[in-house]
């Protein structure tokens, strides 16, 4: 029986070692992707910070307020664009975003609909009984303007058609490799209140046309910034999850190695005792 126990332990050790190779490799890949994602996020933060400053100064200095995306409506319904991931094995990254919506709107879910970005987020949104309006999957590791435009245009149409009174973004903001936080930011109606009189602008020939173009660029820029934050947070969560899995595998291997050695030592001791006992009996 002890010999059978050794074989079972050896089988488990082999299986865990194979799994450890996978988690270790995935952790290294996530670390590499995180490094690239952080670089792209840093660059995008600089761009969006400048865009935000310009937009607020320009809108704040103009008298025109004809753009419908700057005006609220009375519809109580809210559209939430929820950023998740297409791939799993990233800890609570996807579950936390859906749980955030549930916890903050549990008494008003009948007025909430979601646009889900990321295949893995769909399961958690439905699990938390949140209605979905649209789903976007397989967008890739690097956010691009084409995808951002498609999703933003969908939200804009829903808002301008009066189907929703507010559109917001729920995503995981990246602060550091060990700190990410689910946040909600209002997207529509757009609030670009600036300090009036700080900067003077002379716009010709059409002020409304400039505002329309600026608002469109701002919405896409804000959404892209959220996507870059989400991607960096996803890779950080996956890196931590795989590092944790690798450490757990190491701990389990150490425990199994110790157990294997104890059983093996017990078998050897028993065999020696039997040999010695047999020799004594023959005297």
Curated annotation (Swiss-Prot):
Keywords: ATP synthesis, Cell membrane, CF(1), Hydrogen ion transport, Ion transport, Membrane, Transport. One of its GO terms (molecular function) is ATP binding. PROSITE patterns: ATPASE_GAMMA. It is found in: Cell membrane. It holds the Pfam family ATP-synt. One of its GO terms (biological process) is proton motive force-driven plasma membrane ATP synthesis. GO terms for cellular component: plasma membrane; proton-transporting ATP synthase complex. InterPro entries: ATP_synth_F1_ATPase_gsu, ATP_synth_F1_gsu, ATP_synth_F1_gsu_CS. It is a peripheral membrane protein. Produces ATP from ADP in the presence of a proton gradient across the membrane. The gamma chain is believed to be important in regulating ATPase activity and the flow of protons through the CF(0) complex. NCBIfam families: ATPsyn_F1gamma (TIGR01146). F-type ATPases have 2 components, CF(1) - the catalytic core - and CF(0) - the membrane proton channel. CF(1) has five subunits: alpha(3), beta(3), gamma(1), delta(1), epsilon(1). CF(0) has three main subunits: a, b and c. PANTHER family: ATP SYNTHASE GAMMA CHAIN, ATP SYNTHASE SUBUNIT GAMMA, MITOCHONDRIAL. Belongs to the ATPase gamma chain family. This is ATP synthase gamma chain. It comes from Clostridium perfringens (strain 13 / Type A). The lineage of its organism: Bacteria, Bacillati, Bacillota, Clostridia, Eubacteriales.
